[in-house]
Amino acid sequence: MSRFDGRPADLISSRRNPLVHQVRALQQPRGRREQGLLLLEGTHLLQECRRLGLPLDRLIATTRWQEQHPTLLGSEPLQPVSPEVLQAMASTDSPDGVISLLPHPAPGLQAPSWPQAKAP
């Protein structure tokens, strides 16, 4: 995670880093409940979060992904990781370079109403 002093976080290159275990736990309902976070994998889901204005807890991304998608970087903490570490965190076979952690909605919150498509 980015440091509070404004300096970027160090690249995580070890699969034994505690963050790897924390993120992998989010693949299970218990981990999501305990940490209060949702795991979103991929650029498309991050784009949707940005489009909807959803607040993110943090981004975890490879250096290459950051270079290719600078406009998707926001004000939330950014944790750079090696491609091997991202692969260890992800549930997909071929992650595209980014994982977003989103605060889990509080119980009882109503989902936003989506516009209904009109029948032809």
Language-model region placement:
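Boundary-proximal intrinsically disordered activation/regulatory segments immediately upstream
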Residues: 1-67
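RNA substrate-binding interface of SAM-dependent RNA methyltransferases
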Residues: 3-6, 10, 51, 84, ...
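Solvent-exposed alpha-helices and their adjacent loops that cap or buttress functional pockets
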Residues: 30-32, 91-93, 113-116
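Structural motif
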Residues: 36-37, 57-59, 77-79, 96-100, ...
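Glycine-rich nucleotide phosphate-binding loop and flanking beta-alpha elements
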Residues: 46-47, 67, 87, 106-108
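Short, glycine- and charge-enriched coil/turn segments that flank and shape catalytic ligand pockets
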Residues: 53, 64-77, 108-118
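Glycine/small-residue-rich loop that forms an oxyanion/phosphate-binding "nest" at active or ligand-binding sites
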Residues: 69, 73-103
